[in-house]
Amino acid sequence: MSVQPAQEGDTASFIHAARREQLVRCAIELIAEVGPAKASTVRIAERAGVSRGVLTYHFRDRAELIEQVVRSVYDLGLEFLGPRMAAAASPREALLTFIGGSVELYAAHPTEMAALSNIYSDKDGVPRAGHHRHTREMAELAAGLRAGQEQGQFRAFDVDVMCATVRGALDAALAHIAGGGSVEPYASELQTLFDIATTAPRGD
């Protein structure tokens, strides 16, 4: 039986997607090991077992590949945390889920986290503060904190300061995990800390 044109197109698209995924994976691994400055397109292609021409066929330049690495790690985080966040019954539960789940994510996917951290920390890399995925994550965190305040679950505090504090604590958690530390009791202690820091005082 002959392969129909539509089937041929589907096969080609699958192969193309699989090759891009392979190249992104190899880029993640190499950047995690040596940092973005030393992760040249030649070295990434060598790791994937292909020529540099194959890499540049799938990605117009190194910047596009690096951006795809960043996007891939955020997508992984969304896949890991998204269902849990969606199931949270309140802003308080969502905050604690985000904090605890993030620490678990760091432990479950150390290579991806190392790659993203190396990209953000490189002087010529992608600045985290201006990246749209980071900005969106922080905006969602801020929205959850404001919702908690409006519903009376959280006390009055500066949301921007609290967001920055949560992010800083999670950055420290990532360093803890990367250094060989365990998820617990670190995650639960962070949850307790921010639960106390945000919870509205109870009336008499």
Task: Please give the residue ranges for each predicted region.
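C-terminal peripheral helix-coil segments that are non-catalytic and often amphipathic
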Residues: 1-7, 89, 104, 108, ...
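Generic hydrophobic, amphipathic alpha-helix propensity
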Residues: 19-28, 44, 65, 69-73, ...
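Helix-turn-helix
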Residues: 22, 30-64, 68
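Short, charged helix-capping/linker segments at alpha-helix termini
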Residues: 37-38, 153-157
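Short helix-capping/turn signature of helix-turn-helix
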Residues: 59, 118-124
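Hydrophobic alpha-helical connector segments
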Residues: 68, 79-108, 162-166, 187
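Amphipathic alpha-helical packing segments from all-alpha helical-bundle domains
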Residues: 75-78, 82-83, 108, 114-115, ...
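Secondary-structure edge/capping motif, primarily at the C-terminal ends of alpha-helices
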Residues: 84, 116-120, 177-180
